């Protein structure tokens, strides 16, 4: 099949920038349409059209996807308490299915022959893009130049320089960076020596402990149906809420992650993440669930949360299993209404209070050890006998 028109998922980084001349010169593509998703990157998006066009793209489309990114991806992750391997809140992984869906839509609208991405052959994003595209449009051809060209990062930078491509990395600062509203991910370069502390320069949206305020700050986050809706009594739209959560947590140095991560392709890698607001909201949400959900629901949901995070990390956002887990998780959130107080100080976010006027399962009359206690203590003996009966019978059988 001859490929004349391609829609490229474009970030403005060294790999996707180099993909444009590579697709034209090596694949024989006549027209490369660059598509960039606005996911709250801020200033990084300003020069992106010019970069794509100067690299050889026929046009560059920039779509504002911030609203669906928060409401359809970030908020479900908060409701799922999604932490891959117990640490990473999927800030980058959550963006990939949204980008893939819009990429497919644009390809169909423009009647393109194929889509393309600049993911390397050892990363996670190639899996996420390829599977999402195959699920949404199995008939669509996917070109993967960065998986085929066999160049090292230094060689890719040099290749881009030959075509006048201004890359956001250099040989002196060879980090690979992904940025969106939910956070930053940084890898490569000096970070590959896992015995060394990350240079402070890799952090941009969280303060070092030395530069955080000496005075702690207590904030209150209000949830409705499992979604955060207000901070300190002020109801906010989703974008403003995420921005404020990032500012508050980042100012106090909360939200840095330095982890050895198990990639989908089977290798371990060192990843640096800054996700101050998302981590803060997940922590507060977990606490509110502990107040409003029954114990058996919490235990079951905890197991499914791990699976949900794994599926999203592994590129299976559109899978039947992930959609089924959404159904369970969403049903549990009907009762997750209330507020959580969090103290931010020197890199920590400490829960200091929680309340739910509608759905609290903490009943003071039953929990108190004071005179208002309504718990019937004499019922405990019978309960313990029945509860421990299997153990008692097992012990008797051993003593025959």
Swiss-Prot record:
GO cellular component: a single term: cytoplasm
Q: Name the residues that bind L-aspartate.
A: 120, 124-125
Supply the alphabetized keyword list: Amino-acid biosynthesis, Arginine biosynthesis, ATP-binding, Cytoplasm, Ligase, Nucleotide-binding
- Record keyword Cell division present: no
Encoding gene per record: argG
Locate the residues binding ATP: 9-17, 37, 118
Q: Which GO terms describe its biological process?
A: argininosuccinate metabolic process; L-arginine biosynthetic process; urea cycle
MF terms from GO for this chain are: argininosuccinate synthase activity; ATP binding
Q: Does the keyword Cytoplasm apply?
A: yes
| Annotated protein name in UniProt | Argininosuccinate synthase
Reactions catalysed according to its record: L-citrulline + L-aspartate + ATP = 2-(N(omega)-L-arginino)succinate + AMP + diphosphate + H(+)
UniProt cross-references to CDD domains, sorted A to Z:
ASS
Read off the InterPro entries from this record: Arginosuc_syn_C, Arginosuc_syn_N, Arginosuc_synth, Arginosuc_synth_CS, Arginosuc_synth_type_1_subfam, AS_cat/multimer_dom_body, Rossmann-like_a/b/a_fold
Q: Which organism is it from?
A: Prochlorococcus marinus (strain MIT 9211)
Note the SUPFAM superfamilies from the entry.
Adenine nucleotide alpha hydrolases-like, Argininosuccinate synthetase, C-terminal domain
């Amino acid at each position: 099949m001859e490929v004349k028109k391609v829609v490229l998922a474009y970030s403005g980084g060294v790999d996707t920038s180099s993909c444009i001349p590579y697709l034209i010169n090596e694949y024989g593509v006549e027209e490369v349409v660059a598509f960039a998703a606005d996911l709250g990157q801020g200033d990084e998006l300003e020069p992106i059209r010019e970069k794509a066009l100067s690299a050889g793209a026929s046009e560059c489309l920039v779509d504002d996807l911030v609203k669906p990114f928060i409401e359809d991806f970030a908020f479900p992750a908060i409701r799922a308490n999604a932490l891959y391997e117990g640490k990473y809140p999927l800030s980058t992984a959550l963006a990939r299915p949204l980008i893939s869906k819009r990429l497919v839509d644009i390809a169909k609208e423009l009647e393109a022959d194929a889509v393309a991405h600049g993911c390397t052959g050892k990363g996670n994003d190639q899996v996420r893009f390829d599977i999402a595209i195959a699920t949404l449009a199995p008939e669509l051809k996917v070109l993967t130049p960065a998986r085929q060209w066999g160049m090292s990062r230094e060689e890719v930078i040099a290749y881009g320089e030959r075509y006048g491509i201004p890359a956001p990395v250099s040989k002196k600062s060879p980090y690979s960076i992904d940025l969106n509203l939910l956070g930053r991910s940084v890898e490569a370069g000096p970070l590959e020596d896992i015995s060394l502390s990350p240079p402070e320069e890799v952090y941009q949206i969280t303060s070092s402990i030395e530069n955080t305020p000496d005075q702690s700050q207590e904030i209150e986050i209000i949830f409705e149906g499992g979604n955060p809706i207000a901070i300190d009594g002020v109801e906010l739209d989703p974008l403003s809420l995420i921005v404020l959560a990032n500012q508050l947590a980042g100012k106090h140095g909360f939200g840095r992650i330095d982890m050895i991560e198990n990639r989908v392709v089977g290798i371990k890698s060192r990843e640096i993440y800054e996700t101050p607001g998302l981590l803060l909201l997940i922590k507060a949400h977990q606490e509110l669930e502990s107040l409003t959900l029954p114990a058996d629901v919490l235990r079951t949901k905890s197991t499914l949360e791990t699976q949900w995070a794994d599926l999203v990390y592994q590129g299976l956002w559109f899978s039947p299993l992930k959609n089924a887990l959404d159904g369970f998780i969403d049903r549990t959130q009907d009762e997750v209404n209330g507020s959580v107080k969090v103290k931010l100080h020197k890199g920590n976010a400490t829960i200091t209070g929680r309340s739910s006027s509608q759905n609290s399962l903490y009943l003071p009359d039953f929990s108190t050890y004071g005179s208002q206690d309504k718990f019937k203590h004499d019922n405990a003996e019978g309960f313990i006998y029945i509860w421990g009966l299997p153990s008692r019978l097992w012990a008797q059988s051993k003593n025959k």
